[in-house]
């Protein structure tokens, strides 16, 4: 299979699902149906066959790459005459709202932690690095939430830099999708994992995307391997609307929810509002900031109907 995108054709090896699945090479399935149920996100239909065909080969590839990095580190440590360093391997996972980044990240975390070379795999989402709700309101950024300027990039870079440098304990803020805000006084502590998976909308951005100050470091400067989860925009919008309806019946019904006022909407009203949110916020953010970074990824997972992976693109 060859990509129709000329840039992708030049940069990537392209695999159809069947071609990619044979690269599993006898890697055992370690997840049960119940495990997978616990990892699924809202409105996602990931099956065990999807894990077998797509995620197990990817787990094998990443294991080989991480082992090679570890061996290189040992050689360098021996050359420098120093004790083995403890710098974790950092994987970033990017893509649009509603594409299924979080589920992909959780499945990868579960599979990668089964390998003896890297049993400690942590997962951090960049949602926690969004400015607090009060700050977004004060800055007039509430309708730009998810855009690059809505993140505390200084805090995020300091976090990822601390992890990469091998600091014993580094804290990341925790985000609540119920209150639509950071949780005050709570944090996730990352303590020298073998692998860190960093999942978020804009983790592939570089200095090319920030002409104001290209001298400052970016998250992508600290990443060893990057993944982009891709889908056609009409599918993304459809999945967002379906997820919005699911939230209306679930999370939005919580009186503490920032979006509790949506809980009483009819299906038609909810669909109209979800479409408007997509057209005014999520769609423009995808077109302006997220999708343009796609071809910087080392690997692209392309989804088709029903959230099923159809193709995998691997950097040459």
Curated annotation (Swiss-Prot):
Cellular-component GO terms for this entry: cytoplasm
Keywords annotated in UniProt: ATP-binding, Coenzyme A biosynthesis, Cytoplasm, Kinase, Nucleotide-binding, Transferase
PANTHER family attached to this UniProt entry: URIDINE KINASE (PTHR10285)
Name of the gene encoding the protein in the UniProt record: coaA
Name of the protein this chain belongs to: Pantothenate kinase
Catalysed reaction equations from the record: (R)-pantothenate + ATP = (R)-4'-phosphopantothenate + ADP + H(+)
UniProt xrefs under HAMAP family: Pantothen_kinase_1
Associated pathway: Cofactor biosynthesis; coenzyme A biosynthesis; CoA from (R)-pantothenate: step 1/5
Membrane-spanning segments: none
GO molecular function: ATP binding; pantothenate kinase activity
Subcellular location(s) of the protein: Cytoplasm
One Gene Ontology term from the biological process aspect of the record: coenzyme A biosynthetic process
Source species: Shewanella oneidensis (strain ATCC 700550 / JCM 31522 / CIP 106686 / LMG 19005 / NCIMB 14063 / MR-1)
Coiled coil segments of this chain: none
DNA repair recorded as keyword: no
Major enzyme class: transferase
Chain sites annotated for binding ATP: 95-102
């Amino acid at each position: 299979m060859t990509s129709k995108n000329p840039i992708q054709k030049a940069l990537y090896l392209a695999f159809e699902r069947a071609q990619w699945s044979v690269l599993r090479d006898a890697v055992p399935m370690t997840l049960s149906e119940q495990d997978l149920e616990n990892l699924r996100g809202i409105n996602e239909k990931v099956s065990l066959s999807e894990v077998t065909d797509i995620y197990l080969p990817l787990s094998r590839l990443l294991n080989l790459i991480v082992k090679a990095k570890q061996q290189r580190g040992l050689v360098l440590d021996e050359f420098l005459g120093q004790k083995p360093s403890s710098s974790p391997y950092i994987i970033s996972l990017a893509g649009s709202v509603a594409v299924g980044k979080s589920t992909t990240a959780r499945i990868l975390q579960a599979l990668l932690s089964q390998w003896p070379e890297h049993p400690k795999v942590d997962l951090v989402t960049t949602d926690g690095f969004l400015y607090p709700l009060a700050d977004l309101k004060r800055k007039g950024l509430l309708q730009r939430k998810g855009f690059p300027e809505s993140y505390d990039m200084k805090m995020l870079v300091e976090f990822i830099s601390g992890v990469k440098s091998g600091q014993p304990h580094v804290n990341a803020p925790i985000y609540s999708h119920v209150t639509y805000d950071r949780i005050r006084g709570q944090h996730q502590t990352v303590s020298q994992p073998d692998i860190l998976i960093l999942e978020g909308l804009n983790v592939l951005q570089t200095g090319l995307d920030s002409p104001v100050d290209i001298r400052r470091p970016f998250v992508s400067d600290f990443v060893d391997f990057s993944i982009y989860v891709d889908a056609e925009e009409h599918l993304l919008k459809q999945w967002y609307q379906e997820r919005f309806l699911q939230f209306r019946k679930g999370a939005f019904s919580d009186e503490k929810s920032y979006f509790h006022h949506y809980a009483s909407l009819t299906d038609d009203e909810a669909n109209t509002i979800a479409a408007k949110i997509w057209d005014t916020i999520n769609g423009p953010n995808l077109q302006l900031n997220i999708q343009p970074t796609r071809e910087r990824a080392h690997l692209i997972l392309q989804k088709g109907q029903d959230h099923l992976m159809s193709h995998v693109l691997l950097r040459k």
